[in-house]
Amino acid sequence: MPLDGLARAFRVSPHHSSAILLKVNLVAASLDPTSLIDRATFRKAVQDYIVFGNGYLEPVRSRLGGTIALRHAMARYTRRGLIDGDYWWVPGVQEATKLAPGVVHLAMPDVNQELYGVPEYLSALQAALLNEAATLFRRRYYLNGSHAGYILYATGEIDVNDTQAIKDAMRAAKGPGNFRNMFVHAPNGKDGSIKIIPIAEAGAKDEFLGIKNATQADVMAAHRVPPQLLGIVPAQGSAFGNPKDATAMFYELEIEPLQAAFLEVNDRVGQEVVRFRARALASGG
């Protein structure tokens, strides 16, 4: 999956971006800053790691060669070099700047290759894109004035001029303010000589809701985030359970593994760069 595509897909679905930002917020909030990394740098690296499956931290060296800080290198524009350990900043096709030696590259494991990481949610990306497509289609459906779509069936004493006038009126009814009435006078018309046959109005509505619900479930399953933590309202007659219990379980199953992944930075640098505060458990009530 191209990195540009992952960047564009970050906000295609509210459930997709919200789940990512929830993880970023919780991991970043648990950081105990050190002299080598600040909160802003760490947050950017965490977000890149979850969105792209890759996080890069470039060392800042002192005159004596020691590491005095780590700065964030955007995963969208960072590439590995041909020589192992070389990393390049490539914001454009004709632009490339070699990063300082010793770049820390955190990558989510992939079963097919080991050069770059792959985000965990990739299996649900098509569902997130379908969710966006359904929303955009529905929005255009209202903006272009074709709310229902119908066939106007006419027989009887309607001459060519009247037929053309009806066509012109129908064309003028499209677009903003399309809810208009139409008067048709057929002196010798019979019952049923003019019929309006709707096209899939109810079916389109049901299909839209079905797509939204199905894709939401796929995205949330890929991110493994409890629905009550994303502000989702339970269906009528159902409940999600205690949000404190859900938060505690989510923290243990998802946030702590992310913290463990970033502790690898310490092994790469050879000193304590990343450390986390002990989580204060919320008291029950």
Which functions belong to the PLM regions below?
Residues M1-K190:
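Structured, contiguous alpha/beta core segments that scaffold functional sites
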Residues D110-G285:
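A contiguous, surface-oriented mixed alpha/beta subdomain in the mid-to-C-terminal portion of proteins
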